[in-house]
Amino acid sequence: MITIKDVEHISWLASIRVSEEEREELVAQFNTILDYFQQLDEVDTEGVEPTYRVVDLANVFREDVPRDSLTQDEALRNAPRREEGYFRSPRIV
């Protein structure tokens, strides 16, 4: 069971301010959520094969087919800085 102290700790971890009224409301909401989990714990799953997703998805990405791309000159055309055919970026240290 979630208490006001738990909500205060969670809000501290999340770096958010929660009013007293909101704390009480959050206690009720968290406990309702935990009650739902308790109901799920009571479901008989004997003989049910574990699954990671309920929808059978196939690879939704496009085929990896080689195709023409920009030339080096086209890629570097709008680069603010370049050196020896490469993009030049400021030092980041």
Curated annotation (Swiss-Prot):
InterPro entries in the cross-refs: Asp/Glu-ADT_sf_sub_c (IPR036113), GatC (IPR003837)
Alphabetical list of Gene3D superfamilies matching this protein: Glu-tRNAGln amidotransferase C subunit, N-terminal domain (1.10.20.60)
A GO molecular-function annotation: glutaminyl-tRNA synthase (glutamine-hydrolyzing) activity
UniProt EC number: 6.3.5.-
Reaction(s) the record says it catalyses: L-glutamyl-tRNA(Gln) + L-glutamine + ATP + H2O = L-glutaminyl-tRNA(Gln) + L-glutamate + ADP + phosphate + H(+); L-aspartyl-tRNA(Asn) + L-glutamine + ATP + H2O = L-asparaginyl-tRNA(Asn) + L-glutamate + ADP + phosphate + 2 H(+)
Function summary: Allows the formation of correctly charged Asn-tRNA(Asn) or Gln-tRNA(Gln) through the transamidation of misacylated Asp-tRNA(Asn) or Glu-tRNA(Gln) in organisms which lack either or both of asparaginyl-tRNA or glutaminyl-tRNA synthetases. The reaction takes place in the presence of glutamine and ATP through an activated phospho-Asp-tRNA(Asn) or phospho-Glu-tRNA(Gln).
UniProt protein name: Aspartyl/glutamyl-tRNA(Asn/Gln) amidotransferase subunit C
Protein source organism: Methanothrix thermoacetophila (strain DSM 6194 / JCM 14653 / NBRC 101360 / PT)
Classification of source organism: Archaea, Methanobacteriati, Methanobacteriota, Stenosarchaea group, Methanomicrobia
Gene name in the database record: gatC
